[in-house]
Amino acid sequence: WHTADNTEIAVFSAMAHDVMRSVKHENFLLMESTPSMTNWTPVSMLKRPGMHLLSSMQAMAHGSNSVQYFQFRKSRGSCEKFHGAVVDHVGNSGPYDFAKTENTRVFRDVQQVGAVLREMNARGDVYGTAVKPQVAIVYDVENRWALDAAAGPRNKDKDEKYVETLLSHYRPFWDAGVQVDIVDMDGDISGYKLVIAPMLYMYRAGFEQKMRAFV
């Protein structure tokens, strides 16, 4: 977050969550979210106040049943010692001082998310609930690989353009609050009212028949 227009990042994150949910059409687990920043971008930006809760709730809204972290505590060495963590280096040089740790903004942000998740769990109206989108966008990894590996008139940014094209189709539904499944060519498309299949450089066996039957 905060490395570009946050709206564009939010759209990409929403589609990524929908990809995970659509794999089995079930809820998924968000495993490695950072509570503060990463350590692999050109400039590692700390999440602004309220951003951790907002991004965590976005994952829940798109079907996650958890908000888990990488990492719990920053290490003393190795390549991820400055990657974001629930517990910072603060208070870890000697005997562990919980009072110092809990006074960091990042720790309080994590506490806030935990409190909201406990409230949601107590109500029992969010965890495990499912959405049934009427719109599907076909995103096929093998099609992406084939497109990226092909040599032809245009060989620049093929992989990025595929993702950009998917996002350009996804964005209007996101803006309108319309739920979308992201399916591959092996998936069942018969139950949708609208199927969007951009940049089909490659057809898997049987997909043409599915599309003809759909229309």
What are the roles of these predicted feature ranges?
Residues 1-215:
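Carbohydrate-binding surfaces of carbohydrate-active enzymes
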